[in-house]
Amino acid sequence: MAMTVHVDIVSAEEQIFSGLAEFVALPGEAGELGILPGHMPLMTRIKPGAVRVKRPDQAEEELVFVAGGILEVQPGLVTVLADTAIRGKDLDEAKALEAKRIAEEALKNQSTEIDYAKAQAELAEAIAQIAAIQKLRKRGH
């Protein structure tokens, strides 16, 4: 049997995933992070993007989109506290493309620094959702 670590992915609304995993990959603040069983304790912010979870009983990785949040790694436990989390199968490409278009339009028409920062964050989230959808499409879902 492969070594595993318990993974919890939660948002403010609900628990998205809870189970054993052989591997977890996610977008950390300084780049892509890969977590294997036995990883050193760690706490870091995560950026919008796809969290990939390799379960021991499945060939396909589970994909969860997160809009940022916090990652905590402890011995035997990986916890993702996401601002927003959406299961890969629940992502809506048309909605993400529309959010991207609106954010790009807001960037062109911003009136204050706050508007600009908000539009940038919304654009980054929409782009990350689209990238997650494209990963799913490549896998044939």
Swiss-Prot record:
Topology in membrane: Peripheral membrane protein
CC terms in the record's Gene Ontology section: plasma membrane; proton-transporting ATP synthase complex
Alphabetical list of Gene3D superfamilies matching this protein: ATP synthase delta/epsilon subunit, C-terminal domain, F0F1 ATP synthase delta/epsilon subunit, N-terminal
Keyword Metal-binding: no
Sorted UniProt keywords: ATP synthesis, Cell inner membrane, Cell membrane, CF(1), Hydrogen ion transport, Ion transport, Membrane, Transport
CDD domains, A to Z: F1-ATPase_delta
Protein's cellular compartments: Cell inner membrane
GO MF term (any one): ATP binding
Pfam families: ATP-synt_DE, ATP-synt_DE_N
Complexes and interactors: F-type ATPases have 2 components, CF(1) - the catalytic core - and CF(0) - the membrane proton channel. CF(1) has five subunits: alpha(3), beta(3), gamma(1), delta(1), epsilon(1). CF(0) has three main subunits: a, b and c.
NCBIfam families the UniProt entry points to: ATP_synt_epsi, PRK00571.1-4
Family membership noted in the UniProt record: Belongs to the ATPase epsilon chain family.
Function (record text): Produces ATP from ADP in the presence of a proton gradient across the membrane.
Name under which the protein is recorded: ATP synthase epsilon chain
The encoding gene: atpC
